[in-house]
Design a protein with these regions (language model features):
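Catalytic histidine neighborhood in serine/cysteine hydrolases
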Residues: 190-206
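Alpha/beta-hydrolase active-site loop
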Residues: 66, 96-116
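Acidic catalytic loop of the alpha/beta-hydrolase fold
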Residues: 174-179, 205-206
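Short beta-strand/loop motif that positions the catalytic acidic residue
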Residues: 164-172, 176
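Catalytic histidine-centered segment of alpha/beta-hydrolase-like enzymes
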Residues: 94, 203-215
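Short, surface-exposed "cap/lid" segments of acyl-processing enzymes
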Residues: 41-85
Length: 236
């Protein structure tokens, strides 16, 4: 699948679409603009990943370049993918809620995934603010693995949240100009079990000129965690 051309569908599909698709899901404060895509068959794994985008107040959407590359790396690894716009972003209803309402948005999307893919391993992934939302909800939502790109340590408090104990990858640019890299490294050092950390030298927050390196780093790191081969047909 290319992930580039999508077929528009009606609200709340009763099955996971059998081709790249766009559709609204019912969220807590209105519709949530959603995109899905399929891993290539054969080679698909029995897992679906929900991917969250950076801060909408600063222009973040599910079409962000880092989110797009993250989606591609996970799909090429065999996972079917779900992206959506948080409330108040793109065609999604509602307004920004500093991570609280966005957590409810994520829960609504995950509930749909659980309905249409009840036997799949659920993965979560996010970039920047999207990492914050997925980290704080991974345990509650039963994520089997988590991928966090440039988690915004120091910009949003993660103290008191139940940190994930599933396989967890963190990728951080060593020259991030938005999130303090050392704060992230220190935070990770205090987590048990410790996430797998990939430090990318000469790399800023948006991975300019390093997006293909990010893609490769994610694919390499998650390979041992991938679920078994998918036995059902696409869209099943």
């Amino acid at each position: 699948m290319t992930g580039m051309n999508t077929v528009p569908l009606s609200d709340n599909p009763a099955r996971f679409p059998g081709e790249a698709a766009s559709f609204p899901l019912t969220g807590p404060t209105g519709k949530l603009e959603t995109l899905t895509d399929l891993a290539d068959r054969p080679g698909a794994r029995a897992g679906t990943v929900v991917i969250c985008h950076p801060n909408p107040v600063q222009g973040g959407t599910m079409h962000n370049k880092v989110v797009t590359v993250l989606e591609r790396s996970l799909r090429e690894s065999g996972l079917d993918t779900v992206r959506f716009n948080f409330r108040g972003t793109g065609e999604s209803g509602g307004s920004y809620d500093d991570g609280r309402g966005e957590s409810d948005d994520l829960a609504a999307v995950v509930a749909w995934v659980r309905q249409v893919r009840p036997d799949d391993a659920l993965w979560l992934a996010g970039f920047s603010f999207g990492s914050y939302v997925t980290i704080r909800n991974a345990t509650k939502l039963g994520a089997r693995a988590l991928v966090s790109i440039a988690p915004p340590v120091g910009r949003w408090s993660m103290d008191g949240d139940t940190l994930p104990d599933c396989p967890w990858l963190v990728v951080m640019g060593e020259e991030d100009e938005v999130v303090d890299p050392q704060a992230v490294f220190d935070w990770i050092g205090g987590i048990r079990p410790r996430p797998e950390l990939v430090r990318m030298p000469e790399t800023g927050h948006f991975f300019h000129r390093r997006l293909m390196d990010l893609r490769g780093a994610v694919k390499h790191a998650i390979r041992p965690w991938l679920p078994p081969a998918r036995e059902t047909e696409a869209g099943g």
